[in-house]
């Protein structure tokens, strides 16, 4: 079972009495299983600063400076820990991964502009930050975007998901005049759906921060505006950035059965009861979120994937919170089966599966089928504008991946696309696209 809290206090006392230590740096937990590792490096499923009470016991027993770092994501939590005399110094490792300028912003009175860690644990998988694409890419991407020393340009961005918001933010920091069109009544795109499960709603703070920044930077954002080609050309733009995202990829399913997409479920547009079969083609968080969302409502859920494990591309430290909920709610998990077809039969849906190893087929009779296979680019507007643009919508990929400026030629506007309109990926990739492209415009 390891050392108890009291065991550790006694060890700390002995080390202090022996005079061999000057301070204590306290962490809590074990890392021998995935749930314990998740508890040791907690993400958004855990409360902020979950071990402060245990740290307080050390403070009461040992007269040494105490340092502590575990999910202290923001200065308000850090300030509480210090003001209550629980710790002498707070560690904010992931906080500084999200925003290396926490201290500088605080010192200059810009605490409200600090980009706080959301606890997605993206950094545990990829050593990058889900919301700060410059982290670990400092050799070619800036944390601080410099102002363009050349002329101010008119930049039009279409779509206020993470890619569009970041494009607008970075272009505004460059000193350009930015107009942002969004068809919906609020910003966020797919992130708003990702945060529908209550323990993951901290993802919404990514959008909150971006939206607050573009307001500070005086971006002209127009909601409830389905921008068409004429609307964009009327702005007389120098640069047009398409960030219109994608639409659910479900049309490939063979058969005549109704196929429901994840968006309609998470948005509340579709209400499902009975036995719901979810087929996941991506291994990312979306299917997991839908299974969590429905099972919490008491729906009987089967979650199937053709991968060798559920959530093969999800964040490793998010899998334990998902799996805990699935086991508690008797969600049936199925792996190694691809979806062949879905047919309507006697008010049921017959789902035909094939084992990818044996090639044996089997049928499941369910009430509803949800297919999560990512998105297809919503790129109609891009192709409407392509022939009128100076660069014909073409991007130099070598320059793009290095964060260098794209070629400037011709008298017409330059046209680019970022985020899922280029291909179905995740929040980090959408933000990375925009920073790479826009930091040198």
Question: Residue ranges of each PLM-predicted region?
Answer:
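Rossmann-like dinucleotide/flavin-binding elements
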Residues: 149-183, 222-236, 243-316, 357-368, ...
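Local beta-strand N-terminus motif with an aromatic residue
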Residues: 21, 87, 237-238, 366-367
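Short beta-alpha connecting loops at secondary-structure transitions
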Residues: 37-44, 88-89, 191-199, 416-422
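Flexible loop/turn segments at secondary-structure boundaries
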Residues: 1-3, 31-37, 73-79, 97-99, ...
């Amino acid at each position: 079972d390891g050392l108890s809290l009291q065991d550790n206090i006694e060890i700390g006392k002995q080390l202090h009495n022996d005079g061999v230590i000057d301070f204590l740096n306290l962490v809590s937990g074990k890392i021998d299983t995935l749930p314990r590792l998740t508890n040791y490096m907690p993400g958004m499923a855990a409360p902020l600063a979950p071990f402060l009470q245990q740290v307080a016991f050390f403070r009461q027993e040992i007269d040494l400076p105490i340092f502590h770092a575990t999910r202290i994501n923001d200065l308000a939590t850090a300030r509480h820990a210090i003001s209550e005399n629980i710790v002498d110094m707070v560690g904010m490792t992931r906080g500084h991964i999200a925003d290396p300028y926490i201290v500088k912003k605080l010192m200059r009175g810009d605490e409200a502009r600090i980009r706080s860690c959301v606890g997605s644990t993206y950094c545990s998988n990829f050593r990058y930050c889900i919301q700060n694409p410059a982290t670990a890419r400092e050799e070619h991407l800036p944390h601080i975007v410099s102002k363009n020393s050349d002329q101010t340009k008119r930049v039009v961005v279409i779509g206020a998901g993470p890619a569009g918001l970041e494009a607008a933010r970075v272009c505004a920091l460059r000193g350009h005049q930015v107009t942002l069109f969004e068809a919906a009544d609020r910003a966020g795109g797919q992130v708003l759906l990702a945060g529908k499960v209550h323990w993951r709603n901290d993802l919404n703070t990514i959008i909150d921060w971006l939206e607050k920044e573009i307001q500070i930077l005086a971006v002209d954002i127009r909601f409830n505006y389905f921008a068409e080609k004429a609307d964009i050309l009327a702005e007389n733009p120098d640069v047009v950035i398409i960030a219109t995202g994608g639409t659910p990829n479900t049309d490939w399913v063979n058969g005549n059965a109704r196929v429901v997409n994840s968006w309609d479920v998470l948005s509340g547009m579709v209400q499902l009861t009975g036995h719901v079969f979810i087929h996941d083609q991506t291994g990312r968080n979306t299917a997991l979120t839908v299974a969590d969302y429905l099972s919490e409502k008491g729906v009987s859920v089967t979650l199937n994937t053709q991968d060798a494990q559920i959530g093969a591309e999800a964040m490793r430290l998010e899998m334990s919170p998902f799996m805990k909920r699935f086991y508690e709610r008797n969600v049936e998990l199925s792996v190694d089966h691809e979806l062949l077809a879905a047919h309507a039969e006697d008010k049921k849906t017959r789902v035909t599966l094939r084992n990818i190893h044996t090639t044996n087929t089997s049928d499941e009779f369910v009430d509803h089928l949800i297919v999560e296979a990512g998105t297809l680019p919503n790129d109609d507007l891009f192709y409407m504008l392509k022939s009128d643009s100076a660069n014909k919508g073409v991007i130099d990929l070598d320059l793009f991946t290095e964060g260098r400026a794209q070629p400037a030629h011709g008298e017409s506007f330059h046209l680019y696309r970022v985020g899922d309109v280029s291909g179905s990926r995740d929040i980090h990739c959408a933000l990375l696209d925009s920073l790479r492209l826009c930091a040198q415009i």
